[in-house]
Amino acid sequence: MQNYNPNIDSFLKIYSQSLLSTGLTRGLDENTYIQTKLDKALKDDILNGLKKLIVLTGNAGDGKTAFIQLIEAGAEDRGAVFSSRTENGCKFTLNGFEFESLYDGSQDFEGKANDQLLKEFFKPFEGSKEPTAKIVKIIAINEGKLRDFILKKKEYNWLGKEVHHYLEYDNFELNNSLAFINLNNRSVVDIKEQDSIYDELLDVFLDKENKKQLWEPCKTENCSYANNCYIKYNVDTFRDDKKGEVVKNRLKEIILAVYLKKEKHITMRDIRSLISFIFFNKYTCNQLQNSIDNGENLLDRYYYNNTFNDIEQDRMVDILRQIDVADMPLPKLENHLYFQNPRTELEENIFIKGSLDANPDLNYLEEYYKNKPEGTSDNDEIKKESADAFLSSMKRKMFFEGNDDFLREQFDINHYSFLPYKYFERYNQFLRTGKDNNNQLRSDIVLAISKSEKIYNEIIGKENVCISSSSLKKSTTKAFYGFTAADFEIVLPDVGDQTKYIEYFPDHIIFRHVDKSASLEINIDLFEILMRIGEGYVPTSIEIRTFFLNLEMFKRRVLAKRSTKVFLTEDDSNLYLFEKSKSGKLVLSITQ
């Protein structure tokens, strides 16, 4: 059919706020399903009967049901005989093994109480030994429910010990017949890898090798709207041989920033939904063609504006809105952009050269540019809105498509300058390597914590975690307990052998005492605030309320340890040190 791509309708249904249907947001969608580590490491073991119990935990949308349904489909392909199929699981036999799946082990089903469902499901695991029966059970269940059900019942002696040790002890090795996978630890982005879940999903959407010919209907010979279509521009930009990889990696960095904020665990459902909206927005071929025919300015539907949409109710889009690259003040660049038509040769140099035949977004950008206020006395609100739309869109486009070499040469910035995180690269450097050369990062974190307690001597603040004493509040003298910096370390979280089954990239740094009695999780927002405090920044009351709760709890745990040092000062300049000597005597000295 001319001027119509049926694949777009399917992709639109993946978005959580789809106007067509949200039917493809749940369960197994074979068109966009990608093989993950879970499939590669576990599928054959399950179908060959090497695992007796597989437990999947995680959030809704993590792909638990899809994986179980894939196992069932694989079993059917191998000749399995199904005795039961319900909306909550199946029973079947394969090669002499009795299989049972349960999609949701945390809810009642068809009038049967949840505990009764679980009792029947876990029946073979009663007793004090590993079951000998040829069984394979696979269940998706809330971790809390698993704990409550198994650990509170005496009949699960053997399984109870395995569950308890798995939940309570780091790196506990389960019996070989068991596999427990927590999909909350799975990361959809990995800055170190080019085949992360994000990358694999993009490949499915883009069909760059034309194996499925998803975008054949969008060619100019098949669609008369091709040169004016934002969907074609969005897809072609990411498929472009010259700038596609750069744009893909910069979107990856934006999604990584959301991941590192830790406001929301990003599930498979979330990332599929987000990619769908960024590429396609919400409108069908017919609807977008009507908008083009009506002369609407459709700039807000281009991928770089979709990414930071300020209207949608999708949770991922809402978090992306918080890190909108258009909000970062870049005065020199903004002053330049404001007075330059987006079609000038100078503006073309700002962007990476691509091989696209059409750039319809420039028409909309130029329309906003020409409708800006004509001077400081022009108070026309519509013109002000045009100016805002023009500048915001140009900055977003520049983040994704900007030529870093040119930006660095002309404006002393690069695409990272658009992010609200000045220390984004440094944070990710440690996440990638886990290396802190010369303990420089540890020293900077220690200094920031000390400065947050209002101790301003940089040498003392770096060599000691300083925490103020509350006992001298009415005195002009300030006192600080000192804990030697060398007794602390920065490390990455360890998820043990879970990495056999899940894609993993750490989402935080851990700053802790070497004896592990006090530990602080540092996400990217807290890291940013701490680094700025180290430079002399004074956080706002809102920032303190938002980011400092965990920091305050950490300080209390540190204070529970015995300090051998107390620093005293009256003027923040001269510090006196009371320190317990090796002989047990208190020694007073003045610090430099």
Question: Where in the sequence are the language-model features?
Answer:
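Post-Walker A helix-loop "phosphate-sensing" segment adjacent to the P-loop in P-loop NTPases
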Residues: 73-84
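Long C-terminal appendages of very large multidomain proteins
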Residues: 354-592
